[in-house]
């Protein structure tokens, strides 16, 4: 029984299946962890969702910002952009089933035995684990409810960007969503910076990657995350695993086998893919 952690798939279905074949992933025996952003940019978002859903209890995933954006497009709140290549999914006969399943997925995964935590963007250093769990449940409860379109309409925005237990209402939910799905850099006090997307070496002072600021979760748990392709899986402290290696931008899809910390890599097919949404970062 092995545990495989894979970074952002972004609709790269062929690469996902090739990587799982490479590691001899066996559903029912092994467990697959996915860092979120299952969809958008790559050509196979529909196939990715169908496959991941079919795995049942053999998969543990978290929602990413592109997954949430897909839900907003599906409900008519956001525009379907051609570069995201979501039209086959949105027009599929099982779209309702797939997206209602997707919105009921978590923002946070925790394995106490392995001392492993996973979130799409990471864990803000302003939170301890009980706070992170409570915050994840707050957003998950809204997404699972009939009022989820109201939340999706209000989730866009960069403020508030500083955690306080006193945050309430939509501001609280927006901060939680940004921390779990969009965070990269923080100010030294842990306050989120929602604008910088470059590599850590190019970031303006005093910004630091969230994982470079000491926080209570990282003291006791390993943290796996995706979202930040420009890291190229490098430059994180011991126990912090950056798994997004930019498959949808022509990089690769990366898998970490947890038990022996061995990495497996599947190169992107995007150099073969010159259609709408080709591998050019925006």
Curated annotation (Swiss-Prot):
Pfam families: Metallophos (PF00149). One of its GO terms (molecular function) is bis(5'-nucleosyl)-tetraphosphatase (symmetrical) activity. Its EC number is 3.6.1.41. Transmembrane segments: none annotated. Coiled coil: none annotated. Gene3D superfamilies: 3.60.21.10. It catalyses: P(1),P(4)-bis(5'-adenosyl) tetraphosphate + H2O = 2 ADP + 2 H(+). The keyword Hydrolase applies. It comes from the Bacteria. The keyword Hydrolase applies. Keywords: Hydrolase. PANTHER family: CYTOCHROME C5 (PTHR40942:SF4), PTHR40942. Hydrolyzes diadenosine 5',5'''-P1,P4-tetraphosphate to yield ADP. HAMAP family: ApaH. Belongs to the Ap4A hydrolase family. This is Bis(5'-nucleosyl)-tetraphosphatase, symmetrical. The lineage of its organism: Bacteria, Pseudomonadati, Pseudomonadota, Gammaproteobacteria, Enterobacterales.
